[in-house]
């Protein structure tokens, strides 16, 4: 779980670097130590949240328990939470602070179908369960919430200024929950958005990636007798296979 902690620190310190006034603020090292202390103090609680979301293993747009757990954690730590935003029951925006900069931290928490798994290094599907966390989104959502809470404490103590928002973004795995949130204008006042993802190493990625466009294609064939009149028919399957190339 060490990299998990480092990733939370990276998110929180990213905010601090944005929010600081270089001439009048605390040193970044002092803030880093305070953030790390806050995270370590609450580490066992965050670990429990991450394991609970792992066990819930809820697929996109159905992450009811996972979303509620993160929302309640933020509420308990002084955030104002708007739930069910952009027409999605499991989406939320949690806000603390006022004024600029407005920094968003994105939290994902959806699982994937067909990836049921015990917390083991070998493939061990859970009996009678289909979905599971193949991309570590149980850590993703928890880490983002932990970073938001650490930042909130610094704002509360007057050590940094601005507003921190934790965006609960459902259905990253193919459902495009963030798209609907953007369409509803929920990011209009945001100066910068911070995002992370569990991985086997800790790094900053500067690369971009391709977008996803969901579409449906229908292929129509012409029926014919396969033996008596094969030349009269057209196979829809041939067109499907041709599209693979």
Residue ranges with predicted function:
Residues 123-132, 138-139, 155-245:
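Histidine/acidic-residue-rich, glycine-tolerant segments that coordinate divalent metal ions
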Residues 20-133, 142-162:
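Acidic/His- and Gly-rich active-site-bordering loop/insert found
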Residues 1-24:
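Bacterial Sec-dependent N-terminal signal peptides
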